[in-house]
């Protein structure tokens, strides 16, 4: 069993502690809006984020070209500089393609890589391990594994994560598995920095030893996540629990009714942060009923929408 020290505020975690899984803004004609992406990145850092995940699931990476992915990495890195960590979503279900994209991201100067479980192929656990190890060995950048079986179609077994933790470049895990026992096993047997990949599970995962969150809802509530995460790192459960409850209706608004990128773009547009709500197919705009449900949740959270 790994000897894990109590996580504390101020420690220099490789990727920070409050990370937003950024949307990719588009222009009305469907082209990537790099200027809006840079402005959004700057706002998120101003609001309390110390890490940004660029072109992950929420960034609609599966409908971006390689050049668009790379353009987003550069736009965000240029905008925030050293104010926060920029983690590039370079994982695909093609190991060779992922390696190529990761190498090009490294040339741009990103601070790390987010590598998702290879989706659709449904490899064995040995194949999953080999996939991650090959990508992690291809650059000098630190790597965050992304375990999200609901989208990938297959989970990374805790035993596989434990084996992968021995790779010198694999330092973190974005846990979107919603399997507390699996997460507990990983935390008890590795020194990985574990991040909640489910916004609403940030508090319980941090109670077990996670260091923070990679959040979609942080687009519109980064300051509140900063309070929750810092309180948990400091052992102040009362403050963290209060923030957890205050975040609940906002999390529901962003994550419960439509795909997270769709909801986040609408709320950011309502706030005047993004100029439009454009997403790429197969994502589509919410219905009026869905939009009203989102507004109802936001009003419950004290927002005037």
Where are these regions (language model features)?
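C-terminal alpha-helical cap/extension of soluble enzyme domains
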Residues: 3-10, 14-24, 43, 47-49, ...
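Active-site beta->alpha loop and helix N-cap motifs at the rims of alpha/beta catalytic domains
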Residues: 3-20, 24-153, 161-163
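Solvent-exposed, flexible loop/coil residues
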Residues: 27-30, 36, 68, 123-124, ...
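A general structural signal for well-ordered alpha-helical segments in protein cores
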Residues: 37, 69, 73, 98, ...
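Catalytic alpha/beta core domains of metabolic enzymes, predominantly
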Residues: 134-138, 149-248, 252-256
